[in-house]
Amino acid sequence: MVDPSKPPTKKEIDRINRIQRDHFNRLYHLFDPPLPAGVPGRLEKIVAAAAIETGDTVLDVGTGTGILIPIIRHYEPGCIYACDLSEEMLRRLKENYSGVKTIQKDVRELALPDESIDVVFINACYPNIADKAGALKNISRMLKPDGRMIISHPLGKAFIESLRQGAPYPLDDFPLKSETKKLLGPYGFAVKKFVDQPELYILAAVKRR
């Protein structure tokens, strides 16, 4: 796992983000349904881990074409923000789901108000985040006390390992259970749930009061 306290330079972060934006702008159509067998059920487990309550404000980081959005909506949140680097991903999301507030921006640069978010999902994109320290710091700022953050992947850690060699941008590992306290503690998070199965990864954390 890359040490989040030692992020790349701003120039390198911008370069990585530009490569990812262009990559997903070209390939956004590959993320359209139908999803692989078993994935819908695992996505439901990921969203359930956040314990969304009616009226909650939810932020979906690296939302892509919005695969979590219909599941999140089952819980009747008050507002959904969807953040992604790729304008084509967000365009497809807006075609499929009305009423979602889309933001094309790196999560570390999101300017939502302090303590305004109840739940943050980082699904299938944590390894892609170039500046994890900046991302976690900003997410902590935006989350309310007792707000929940879910880092997840519906295909598990091995899927990321299979992508790493061919990816045109760096892909980090998902944190091991033994690494979570060191990773998240400095940003005020306590881990509440950890699942590391061959085809499912869930790290659920709560922002301490």
Give the positions of each predicted feature.
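Short catalytic micro-motifs in class I SAM-dependent methyltransferases
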Residues: 124-125
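Conserved class I S-adenosyl-L-methionine
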Residues: 1-51, 67-71, 89-92, 150-174, ...
